[in-house]
């Protein structure tokens, strides 16, 4: 079973549509929920297919950041989940920038959670190992089981 979930704070100074647009640069969601935590809205976007990450897959190659992405994705594996964060303001202009913690993105990071039976298979598809910047393999998208 596949579950991709993206969580982002929407602060009072932000426009929810701009945050959705930033996320949409990398992720095609099927379902949207919003909840309130004090004065902050929390967006929770979900999809049940790895195809929702095809934009993310493409951007990793276009920006030539496969090695960096692989490091963040591998570091984020716990059990059957991959967790990582990207910079919200960079995402708003279509640039993918990983962050180590929420404080690195002044308006809060965008958090990704990918649940899959074999997370390393997802990492190998999204960000394969490289040699001199060239991917060593180009795996097909893992099946949605």
UniProtKB/Swiss-Prot annotation:
Signal peptide: none
Disulfide bonds: none
Pfam families in the record: RNA_binding (PF01877)
Gene3D superfamilies reported in the protein's UniProt record: 3.30.1440.10
Family under the similarity heading: Belongs to the UPF0201 family.
Protein name, entry field: UPF0201 protein M1425_1179
Organism of provenance: Saccharolobus islandicus (strain M.14.25 / Kamchatka #1)
């Amino acid at each position: 079973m596949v579950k991709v979930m993206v969580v982002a704070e929407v602060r009072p100074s932000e426009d929810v549509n701009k945050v959705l647009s930033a996320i949409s640069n990398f992720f095609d969601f099927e379902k949207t929920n919003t909840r309130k935590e004090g004065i902050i809205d929390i967006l929770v976007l979900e999809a049940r297919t790895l195809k929702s990450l095809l934009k993310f897959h493409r951007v990793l190659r276009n920006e030539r950041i496969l090695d960096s992405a692989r490091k963040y994705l591998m570091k984020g594996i716990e059990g059957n989940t991959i967790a990582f964060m990207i910079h919200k303001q960079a995402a708003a202009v279509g640039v993918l920038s990983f962050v180590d913690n929420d404080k690195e993105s002044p308006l809060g990071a965008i958090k990704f959670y990918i649940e899959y039976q074999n997370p390393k298979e997802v990492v190998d598809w999204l960000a394969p190992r490289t040699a001199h910047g060239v991917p060593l393999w180009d795996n097909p998208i893992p099946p949605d089981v």
